[in-house]
Structures are given as structure tokens and as C-alpha cells.
Amino acid sequence: MSGLFRGRVMTGLNVRIGQGYDVHAFGPGDHVMLGGVRVPHRCGVLAHSDGDVILHALCDAMLGALGLGDIGQHFPPSDVRWKGADSGVFVRHCHLLLRERDWCVGNVDATAICESPKIAPYVNAMREGIARLLEVQPECVSVKATTSEGLGFIGRGEGLAAQVVVLLYRLNGVVV
């Protein structure tokens, strides 16, 4: 059984998993974008686009599951078109890529890693917004937060990060 798949490209599977990570340093501003939601904060983030770490990590997770590189390859920071761009544009692009390849989003599990801002009051809006972008039900999207317990650049309040896992599926080759 161990040699059953040796030398074969596993393209016939009906499930794929992708993982994404993004990080941004804090900078001037009065809010951060997280999961497509404007969250008031003592500062903004240093980024070429709107710097939404959750949506950027979501893009990388989808692109990774599809084997299509990363967000920087699709939306290079050197391209002036993406200066200050709404990260929802990036998510819609990645979602279109997966739909064109007959994949659907099964679920999204996102974790924001930050000492501040506190995101609990905004989680439902994030879940609903991400669900709309991906054309899934909000219960298919989890958004939560954790801290780094005061350790590292996040613990010192210098920035924030996010990790996202996405499950893609095909239902007997039929797109739903």
C-alpha cells in the first residue's frame, strides 16, 4: 500500500487544504482593517494595500491550496494599482481562480494574533463579510484571536499577524 501513489501526481483528490500567514507592522493611522472590517485602533499598519492581515492570509491559503503561488505574485507591492487597495478585491480574485478550477470553499478558520486591538466586538461582522466574499454561509467561517503573551514584536505592540486555514472541495466533480 505504501507504494500505491508513488510517482503519481495527486490531482484527482476532491479535497485540498491551504494555509496562509501574513504580518504587518503598526504605523500611522487610527484603525486597522481585519477580516474586511474597519477596527478602530491607536495606529494603522504599514502596507501597500489596506494591510488586512486576515484577508491576505486567506488569499495565500486559497492560492496555496490551488498550487498557484502567493498573494505577492498576483498583486505585487511594486504595482501602483494596488496602493491602498481594498483586500476584498484580492479575495474575490482568488475565489474566482478556485471557482474557475471547479473548487468550492468548505470552511475557513482564521486566527488574528495581536495584543491589540481587541477584535471580539467585530468577529461576527468579519465572519459575515468573509462569507459573502466566498459565497458560503457564515457558519463556514471562523474568526478568532489570540495574543503572543507579551512575547516578540507582537507582544511589544509593534504589529499584528494572522493565520488562516481553508478547506476546498469538489462534490463529485460538480460545482455547487
Curated annotation (Swiss-Prot):
The record marks H48, T147 as: Transition state stabilizer. It is an enzyme of class 4 (lyase). GO terms for molecular function: 2-C-methyl-D-erythritol 2,4-cyclodiphosphate synthase activity; metal ion binding. Its EC number is 4.6.1.12. It catalyses: 4-CDP-2-C-methyl-D-erythritol 2-phosphate = 2-C-methyl-D-erythritol 2,4-cyclic diphosphate + CMP. InterPro entries: MECDP_synthase, MECDP_synthase_CS, MECDP_synthase_sf. Keywords: Isoprene biosynthesis, Lyase, Metal-binding. CDD domains: MECDP_synthase. 4-CDP-2-C-methyl-D-erythritol 2-phosphate binds at D22, V23, H24, H48, S49, D70, I71, G72, T146, T147, S148, E149, F153, R156. It comes from the Bacteria. Belongs to the IspF family. Homotrimer. This is 2-C-methyl-D-erythritol 2,4-cyclodiphosphate synthase. It comes from Xylella fastidiosa (strain 9a5c). The gene is ispF.
